[in-house]
Amino acid sequence: MDTVKNYLSVAFFAFWGGLARYGLTEAFSFYGTVIANLLGCFLLAFLTYFFLRKSNSRAWLTTGLGTGFVGAFTTFSSFNLDAFKLLLGGQNFGALLYFTGTIAAGFLFAWAGKQAANFAAGKLLERG
């Protein structure tokens, strides 16, 4: 039963994650990919560390939000395609800056997500 619940949770949240990414891409074009990936780094780290600190977290919710929503929201393939398009357009430095800058910023956003999760979980634990 838990396996079915996990699959349904992933499917449900992936639908919303995909719609959110599509909306960002429509609204911000090229920058939508960057925004989605950096927010995804923050969200995945936040969710992971937040639910690790909560003793009563539900596996189906963690799986659905992490694998489903964040997995559908972020896009490694579009990130690489955008960098490749910059290279093909003769923007070698721009491609290098985009690629390395996004990776470095992703680490920073993941760190910030972990810090925010620890803070939020700590506040919840204080309240009891």
From Swiss-Prot:
Keywords: Cell membrane, Ion channel, Ion transport, Membrane, Metal-binding, Sodium, Transmembrane, Transmembrane helix, Transport. Its main location: membrane. It comes from the Bacteria. GO terms for molecular function: fluoride channel activity; metal ion binding. Fluoride-specific ion channel. Important for reducing fluoride concentration in the cell, thus reducing its toxicity. It is found in: Cell membrane. This is Fluoride-specific ion channel FluC 1. InterPro entries: FluC. Belongs to the fluoride channel Fluc/FEX (TC 1.A.43) family. Na(+) binds at G71, T74. Pfam families: CRCB (PF02537). GO terms for cellular component: plasma membrane. The gene is fluC1. It is a multi-pass membrane protein.
